[in-house]
Swiss-Prot record:
A cellular component annotation (GO) from this entry: nucleus
Source organism, top-level taxon: Eukaryota
Feature: compositional bias, Basic and acidic residues: 423-434
Keywords of the record: DNA-binding, Nucleus, Transcription, Transcription regulation
Species of origin: Dictyostelium discoideum (Social amoeba)
The protein's name in its UniProt record: Myb-like protein D
UniProt gene name: mybD
GO biological process: mitotic cell cycle; positive regulation of transcription by RNA polymerase II
Keyword Cytoplasm assigned: no
């Protein structure tokens, strides 16, 4: 049993083989039972199974106890027989177990190997089946695609056939109308000719009747009238023949004209195509030249804009320098004027003090002689003269001082007026500068586009944006950018902080990618539409060629119809010629009657 358990462990390879193992164990048990039965049958029923043997042994013992006649020798012989039987049974069992175990091992190993091979074969078969199925599916898909393409081609062919049918119908209608027109013209011509012939015949008959009335006149005038009438009839017949010939010529000319028109149309179409191709080439050349000129003009404009910006900067700097110089000059002038004013004031004060001192001294001198009456009269006269002279000098000095003061006041007023005028002019210059500054604050569309590009690049860093605008101040740039954001022309990229700026950049990149994809899609759609248009143009050209062929055929048919009409007219002319012969016979008969 231990060997059998070890073998079962060795044989257990996979859970899938557990059923085989159980079956093998059942086979082992059945083989054991069969071997025991075979052994019993071989020994002719001498050996009993172990359970029966034990029962028999007990029965013998019971019999021994019951029967006193049994001997001890018989008991020993029975025991020996039992031991030999047991040994033989054990040997047989061991042999049968070993055989069965070996057989089971071999069977299990072979079965497991066969099962493994079978499983591998099954897997390979399944893989092959899957590959075949995939190939079949691919073939089916390809067939479906081919069928779809064929259906599309069939629809295109059907459309082309419908177009051809419509074109053929139109051509047939046109040919039918042309034929009807030609037939109507021919009918009208024939009717006119017949009417003319009938009228001529009626005139001839009337003339014949009149001639018959005047038969037997004595003067022979009726004969002259008859001859004149016959001549008139002959002339009418000749005119009819000429008219018929002219009609035939006209018909031939019409046919020739139709053919020439068709040929001219072909030639004209070819010339038109060539002219259009030449125009396209010339237009392409002109477009290239215009593009080059536009690029040159753009370059010149950019260069001139740079020069203008530099020129404006130099002008602004020169204006500022002039303003600073004027301010410095006005300050220096005001200082010099103040110094002159102070000097004039000091002079006036000194003169006034001198005059006052002199007046006081003179009063003292004038009082002194009155207080000293002891002096001579000469002295009095001298003193009076001197006093009068002094008084006159005093008045003259006062007048001079007053004149000087007036002159100084006038000078001061003039200087003040000049300074006020200068200040006003400086203020005006400042106002003009502000106005010029405001004029530079006007924004153009190009500047707005430039502003949008810089805003998308730098965000709300107005310093970086202002570095690209030399004409504007930083405040103007910022205010204009905020105005564009308020209007909606610019998006507020970082409304809540720096993080939004990064998001804005990512959004811009995504938008740029979307725009590129849209442009690619639009280009592909345009190319597809162009290809469709080219195919339709190709089909239209083919249809036009077919139509031209059909028109040529219809013209040939018309030519044949015209020939038939000409033949008919020729027959009518023969009839008129026969009528002419009949008339000539009538005239000869008339002459014979006269005779």
């Amino acid at each position: 049993m231990q060997q059998q358990s070890e073998i079962s462990k060795q044989v257990f390879i996979s859970p899938d083989l557990s059923d085989n193992y159980n079956n093998n164990n059942s086979n082992i048990n059945t083989n054991n039972n069969n071997s025991i039965n075979d052994y019993e049958n071989q020994n002719n029923g001498l050996v009993v199974p172990q359970s029966n043997q034990n029962q028999q042994y007990q029965d013998d013992q019971n019999d021994s106890f019951d029967d006193d006649s049994m001997d001890e020798g018989e008991e020993k012989s029975n025991l020996i027989i039992d031991e030999s039987q047991q040994n033989s049974l054990n040997n047989n069992n061991n042999n049968s177990e070993n055989n069965n175990i070996n057989n089971s091992e071999n069977n299990n190993i072979n079965n497991s190997e066969n099962n493994i091979h079978n499983n591998n074969n099954n897997n390979n078969n399944n893989n092959n089946n899957n590959n075949n199925n995939n190939n079949n599916n691919n073939n089916n898909n390809n067939n479906n695609n081919n069928n779809n393409n064929n259906n599309n081609n069939n629809t295109i062919n059907n459309n082309n056939n419908n177009n051809n049918i419509n074109n053929n119908i139109n051509n047939n209608n046109n040919n039918y109308n042309n034929n009807n027109i030609n037939n109507n013209n021919n009918i009208n011509n024939n009717n006119n000719n017949n009417n003319e012939n009938n009228n001529n015949n009626e005139n001839n008959n009337n003339n014949n009747e009149n001639n018959n009335k005047f038969i037997g006149s004595p003067m022979g005038e009726p004969q002259i009238n008859n001859n004149n009438n016959n001549n008139n009839n002959n002339n009418n017949n000749n005119n009819n023949n000429n008219n018929n010939n002219n009609n035939n010529k006209n018909n031939n000319n019409n046919n020739n004209n139709n053919n020439n028109n068709n040929n001219n149309r072909k030639f004209d179409d070819q010339q038109i195509i060539k002219d259009l191709e030449n125009r396209l080439k010339e237009a392409k050349k002109t477009n290239q030249l215009l593009d080059e000129k536009c690029n040159q003009l753009k370059k010149n404009i950019t260069e001139k804009n740079h020069l203008l910006s530099r020129y404006i900067n130099t002008l602004n700097s020169s204006v500022l320098q002039k303003k600073t110089l004027n301010r410095n000059r006005s300050r220096s002038r005001s200082r010099s004027n103040s110094r002159s004013h102070s000097r004039s004031r000091s002079r006036s004060r000194s003169l006034s003090s001198i005059s006052r001192s002199r007046s006081r001294s003179r009063l003292i001198y004038s009082r002194s002689p009155s207080q000293s009456p002891q002096k001579n009269n000469n002295n009095n006269n001298n003193t009076n003269k001197s006093n009068s002279n002094n008084n006159n000098n005093h008045f003259n000095n006062n007048n001079n001082n007053n004149n000087n003061n007036n002159n100084n006041n006038n000078n001061n007023n003039n200087n003040n007026n000049n300074n006020n005028n200068k200040r006003k002019s400086e203020d005006d210059n400042q106002d003009d500068g502000k106005k010029k500054h405001r004029k530079n604050a006007i924004w153009t569309q190009e500047e707005d586009e430039k502003m949008a590009q810089l805003y998308n690049k730098y965000g709300k860093s107005w310093k970086a944006i202002h570095s690209h605008f030399d004409d504007k101040t930083r405040e103007q740039v910022q205010s204009h950018g905020q105005y564009l954001i308020r209007i909606g022309k610019l998006e507020d990229i970082h409304r809540d902080g720096r993080k939004e700026r990064r998001k804005g950049k990512q959004a811009l990149q995504e938008r740029q990618q979307q725009l590129e994809q849209q442009n690619q899609q639009n280009n592909n759609n345009n190319n597809y539409n162009n290809n469709i248009n080219n195919n339709s143009n190709y089909n239209n050209n083919n249809n036009n060629i077919n139509n031209s062929i059909n028109n040529n055929n219809s013209n040939q048919n018309n030519y044949s119809d015209n020939n038939s009409n000409n033949n008919n007219n020729y027959g009518d002319n023969n009839i008129t010629h026969n009528n002419y012969n009949d008339n000539s016979l009538n005239s000869s008969n008339y002459v014979n009657n006269d005779n």
